[in-house]
C-alpha cells in the first residue's frame, strides 16, 4: 500500500473513531493540518499548456503545510507530515508548500476527498516568468493544478522556491534545486486561483453564476480579470476588467468590482441563459507577477413537453407522441401498454419523425405507434427520459376496441337524438301558453275599446235629446 493510501486510511480511521466515541461540538474550531497529495511532475521537456503523458512525468507528492481547516472534533488524532514516513526504494519528488501568504478555502475538500470516495488529480509543472535572467536564476517557480472528482473544486497554485544558493548540502539531481534535510523541495504559495465546481448545469432562460476566486501574497497587484468562452472550436471574450474598468461583451454579463478587492471574488453572472451561452468558460486572473486560470463547463438544459394524441379511429388506431422544446439532443422515448387488470409492458415498433430545431435552439420530435387495443381496451403511455428531468415524464391515453367505439358512437348519437326531441317538446309546450296570453291581451284591448265607444254614443245621444 502506497504512502498516500496509508495516510488516507489513518485519516479515515481517525474520523470514524472520533465520530463513534464523542459527539460533534456545536461550533467547529479552526486547526492547521498538513494536506498530503499524490501528484505527477511534468518534466521540463513536456509540452506546456497540456497534460503531460506518462513518459513525460515523474511521481511526486505535494505537502501543503499547516493549512487551516474547520475541525469538528474528528481531527484530534490526525498527525502532520513526517519526511521519514515517505522513505521508499523509489521515493517521489516531495514538494513542501507553505500557505502562510495566501488562503486555501477548499482545503477541506482536498483533505477529505479520499475518505469521501473521490479522487484528487494533481499535476505539478515548471512555471516560467517573463523576467530578467538574473532574477530567474535566484529562484524557481512551479504551478500545481488540483481537481477533485465528482463535481468538486479545482485549485491552481503558483509556488516559489527560496533563494537558490550553491552552499546547500543536499541537491536534487534532476531539478537542480536545493533540498531540505528531509529531502524535500521547499516552496511558498504566492498565488492561487480556484473554483468551487468544475461543471454547472442551468435551465434555459435562468441566471447562472460562475464561481472564480483568488488569493495573492502581499506585494502583488491585481492587473486584470478576463472571462472567455470556448465552444465548438470558437473562442470569444465574455467579460474583461482592467485597471478598475469593466466591459461586458456578452449582454447582461456582470462582475462585481467591489468583490475583487474585498473578497477576491471574480465570479461572473450571466442572466437570461440561451443555448449560445453553453460551453467552456475560462476565468483568467493576472497579477503584477503571476497569471493563472480556472476552467468551468457550463451546460444548458431545457425540459421537454410531452403530448399524446390519437391520430385516427381506424381499425388499428395510430398514437402520436409529440416531444417538444428539449435540449440537449439526447432523449429516450419508450412506449408501454397496460390492459385492464394487468401490468405495464414495454412495446416496440414505434417510428420517429425527422428532428426539428427551433430558432431558440431547442429540439422537437414525434414518435408514432400503431395501437392494438385488444378485446377489453388498453392504456398506452409515452414515457420520455431526458437529462433535464429528475424522473421520466409521461402521457397516457386509453384505446378501446372497434366494437366499443361503435357502441359508444351509437350511444352518443342516441343521446343527441333524445336531447333534440326533448328540446322540440319543450318548445311545443311553451307555444300554446304564449298564444293564450296574446289572445287574452287582445280581448282586453277590444273590451276596453268597446266600452269607450259605448260611453261616447250615450253622451252624444244625451246631447241631442236636450231642448234648445
From Swiss-Prot:
Membrane topology of this protein: Single-pass type I membrane protein
Transmembrane segments: 406-426
Ig-like C1-type domain segment(s): 304-394
Record topology, Cytoplasmic segments: 427-468
Known outcome of mutating residue 230 to S: Loss of MR1 expression at the cell surface
One GO location term (cellular component): Golgi membrane
Phenotype upon changing residue 115 to A: No effect on cell surface expression of MR1-metabolite antigen complex
Lumenal compartment spans: 19-405
Keywords assigned by UniProt, alphabetized: Cell membrane, Disulfide bond, Endoplasmic reticulum, Golgi apparatus, Immunity, Immunoglobulin domain, Membrane, Microsome, Repeat, Signal, Transmembrane, Transmembrane helix
CDD domains: IgC1_Tapasin_R (cd05771)
Effect recorded for residue 228 to E: Loss of MR1 expression at the cell surface
Compartments where found: Cell membrane; Endoplasmic reticulum membrane; Microsome membrane; Golgi apparatus membrane
Sequence ranges assigned to domain Ig-like V-type in this UniProt record: 181-297
MF terms in GO: MHC class I protein complex binding; TAP complex binding
Signal peptide (UniProt feature, chain positions): 1-18
GO biological process terms on file: negative regulation of antigen processing and presentation of peptide antigen via MHC class I; peptide antigen assembly with MHC class I protein complex
Induction details: By interferon gamma.
Result, substituting residue 282 to K: Decreases cell surface expression of MR1-metabolite antigen complex
UniProt-listed Gene3D superfamilies: Immunoglobulins (2.60.40.10)
Function summary: Component of the antigen processing and presentation pathway, which binds to MHC class I coupled with beta2-microglobulin/B2M. Association between TAPBPR and MHC class I occurs in the absence of a functional peptide-loading complex (PLC).
Quaternary data: Interacts with peptide-free HLA-A*02-B2M complexes or those loaded with low affinity peptides, likely facilitating peptide exchange onto higher affinity peptides. Interacts with MR1 in a ligand-independent way; this interaction may stabilize MR1 pool and facilitate ligand loading and dissociation.
PANTHER family in the cross-refs: TAPASIN
Record-given protein name: Tapasin-related protein
Amino acid at each position: 500500500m502506497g504512502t498516500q493510501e496509508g495516510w488516507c486510511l489513518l485519516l479515515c480511521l481517525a474520523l470514524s473513531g472520533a465520530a463513534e466515541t464523542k459527539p460533534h461540538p456545536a461550533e467547529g474550531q479552526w486547526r492547521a493540518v498538513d494536506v498530503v497529495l499524490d501528484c505527477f511532475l511534468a518534466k521540463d521537456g513536456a509540452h506546456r499548456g497540456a497534460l503531460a503523458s506518462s513518459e513525460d512525468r515523474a511521481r511526486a507528492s505535494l505537502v501543503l503545510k499547516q493549512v487551516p481547516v474547520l475541525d469538528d472534533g474528528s481531527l484530534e488524532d490526525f498527525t502532520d507530515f513526517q519526511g521519514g514516513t515517505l522513505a521508499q526504494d523509489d521515493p517521489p519528488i516531495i514538494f513542501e508548500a507553505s500557505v502562510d501568504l495566501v488562503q486555501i478555502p477548499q482545503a477541506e475538500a482536498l483533505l477529505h476527498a479520499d475518505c469521501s470516495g473521490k479522487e484528487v488529480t494533481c499535476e505539478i509543472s515548471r512555471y516560467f516568468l517573463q523576467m530578467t535572467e538574473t532574477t530567474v536564476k535566484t529562484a524557481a517557480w512551479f504551478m500545481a493544478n488540483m481537481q477533485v472528482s465528482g463535481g468538486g473544486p479545482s485549485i491552481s497554485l503558483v509556488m516559489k522556491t527560496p533563494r537558490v544558493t550553491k552552499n546547500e548540502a543536499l541537491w536534487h539531481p534532476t531539478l537542480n534545486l536545493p533540498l531540505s534535510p528531509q529531502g524535500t523541495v521547499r516552496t511558498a504559495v504566492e498565488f492561487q486561483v480556484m473554483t468551487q465546481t468544475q461543471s454547472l448545469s442551468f435551465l434555459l432562460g435562468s441566471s447562472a453564476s460562475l464561481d472564480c476566486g483568488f488569493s495573492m501574497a502581499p506585494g502583488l497587484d491585481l492587473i486584470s480579470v478576463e472571462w472567455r468562452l470556448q465552444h465548438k472550436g470558437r473562442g470569444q471574450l465574455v467579460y474583461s476588467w482592467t485597471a478598475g474598468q469593466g466591459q461586458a461583451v456578452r449582454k447582461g454579463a456582470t462582475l462585481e468590482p467591489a468583490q475583487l478587492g474585498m473578497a477576491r471574488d471574480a465570479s461572473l453572472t450571466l442572466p437570461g441563459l440561451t443555448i449560445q451561452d453553453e460551453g467552456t468558460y475560462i476565468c483568467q486572473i493576472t497579477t503584477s507577477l503571476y497569471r493563472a486560470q480556472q476552467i468551468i463547463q457550463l451546460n444548458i438544459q431545457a425540459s421537454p413537453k410531452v403530448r399524446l394524441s390519437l391520430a385516427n379511429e381506424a381499425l388499428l388506431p395510430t398514437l402520436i407522441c409529440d416531444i417538444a422544446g428539449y435540449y440537449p439532443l439526447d432523449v429516450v422515448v419508450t412506449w408501454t401498454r397496460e390492459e385492464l387488470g394487468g401490468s405495464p409492458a414495454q412495446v416496440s415498433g414505434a417510428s420517429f419523425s425527422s428532428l426539428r430545431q427551433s430558432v431558440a435552439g431547442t429540439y422537437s420530435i414525434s414518435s408514432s405507434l400503431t395501437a392494438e387495443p385488444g378485446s377489453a381496451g388498453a392504456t398506452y403511455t409515452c414515457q420520455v427520459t431526458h437529462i433535464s428531468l429528475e424522473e421520466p415524464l409521461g402521457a397516457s391515453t386509453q384505446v378501446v376496441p372497434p366494437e366499443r367505439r361503435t357502441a359508444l358512437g351509437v350511444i352518443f348519437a342516441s343521446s343527441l337524438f333524445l336531447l333534440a326531441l326533448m328540446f322540440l317538446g319543450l318548445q311545443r309546450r311553451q307555444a300554446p301558453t304564449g298564444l293564450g296570453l296574446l289572445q287574452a291581451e287582445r280581448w282586453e284591448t277590444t273590451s276596453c275599446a268597446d266600452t269607450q265607444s259605448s260611453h261616447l254614443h250615450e253622451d252624444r245621444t244625451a246631447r241631442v235629446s236636450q231642448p234648445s
